[in-house]
């Protein structure tokens, strides 16, 4: 599903410039046809029981900034978002959620390419940016949560995708800092991640209904998977050790309604045995760190290539 197509990037700016900006223009921007119920029927018949539905929201949180743009790039600084989700976009997201739920599968609905390396990313793991965008982020999740507050446990909300620091650092915060790793900058990024996660939980729970106990997914910095058997940096586990599980009011029979997410990509395809050992070492590392958190872990993305 390409509800995560990022129209703020130069390659997709044609959506804003030359069309009526209907949901299908975004949905097909990366070459995929309009999503139909048959797609999820196929997944169900193939044995899948859960679908992650990635959605990028920023092109649909206020249209004035695109109409005023004269360049082929969008700047979240010069053309700020209003935060009001376009009803047509929310309706389309709702339709696809229903496609999934109707197959009796779990649906994980998220905020996707509002994060990442795109020039349009407005969710940045940075203390100053968090303070600036906290109200906007809260407003977005409040609207999503209100839209689906009566849905049952098959619908899960995911806070954000791969949120990066101001240096677009992967693997751990401040990896790409000019002059090398900065402890101050790294801590600022990790604190921002923790604040975003807590804000997400608070916003959803405040809407009531079934959101009071809905299962919620929070993600590590950049969705990092930590160290494996190639410990090339002492900072690889920081996205884990610096992560603080949000305070949450939802507890059933002593169990929290929170899930932690990481992503895992293995780039070495030349030696399958080495790739296998790397994956096993990653899982072993996860097991050694997270039992104390007492919440499940999911691998929301995985693959042999980026």
Across the structure, where does each feature detected by a protein language model lie?
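Short, solvent-exposed loop/turn and secondary-structure capping segments
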Residues: 6-7, 63-65, 119-120, 168-170, ...
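An active-site-proximal structural segment forming one wall of the substrate-binding cleft
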Residues: 22-51, 55, 59-61, 65-159, ...
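A solvent-exposed, charged loop/short amphipathic helix patch at secondary-structure junctions
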Residues: 7-26, 69-80, 171-185
């Amino acid at each position: 599903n390409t509800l995560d197509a990022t129209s703020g990037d130069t390659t997709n700016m044609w959506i804003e410039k030359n069309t009526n900006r209907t949901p299908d223009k975004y949905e097909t921007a990366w070459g995929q046809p309009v999503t139909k119920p048959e797609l999820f029927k196929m997944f169900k018949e193939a044995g899948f029981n859960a679908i992650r539905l990635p959605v990028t929201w920023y092109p649909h949180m206020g249209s004035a900034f695109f109409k005023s743009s004269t360049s082929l790039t969008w700047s979240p600084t010069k053309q700020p978002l209003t935060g009001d989700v376009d009803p047509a976009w929310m309706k389309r997201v709702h339709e696809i959620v229903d496609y999934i739920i109707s197959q009796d599968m779990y649906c994980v609905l998220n905020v996707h390419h509002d994060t990442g390396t795109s020039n349009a990313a407005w969710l940045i793991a940075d203390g100053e940016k968090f303070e600036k965008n906290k109200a906007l982020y809260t407003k977005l999740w409040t609207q999503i949560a209100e839209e689906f507050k009566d849905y049952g446990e098959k619908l899960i909300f995911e806070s954000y995708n791969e949120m990066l620091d101001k240096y677009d650092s992967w693997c751990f915060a401040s990896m790409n800092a000019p002059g090398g790793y900065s402890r101050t900058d790294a801590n600022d990024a990790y604190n921002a991640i923790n604040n975003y996660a807590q804000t997400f939980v608070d916003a959803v729970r405040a809407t009531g209904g079934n959101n009071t106990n809905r299962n919620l997914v929070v993600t590590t910095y950049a969705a990092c998977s930590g160290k494996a058997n190639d410990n090339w940096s002492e900072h690889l586990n920081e996205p884990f050790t610096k992560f603080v599980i949000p305070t949450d009011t939802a507890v059933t029979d002593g169990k929290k309604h929170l899930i932690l997410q990481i992503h895992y990509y293995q780039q070495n395809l030349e030696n399958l045995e080495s790739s296998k050992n790397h994956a096993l070492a990653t899982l072993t590392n996860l097991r050694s760190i997270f039992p104390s958190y007492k919440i499940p872990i999911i691998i929301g993305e995985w693959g042999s290539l980026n």
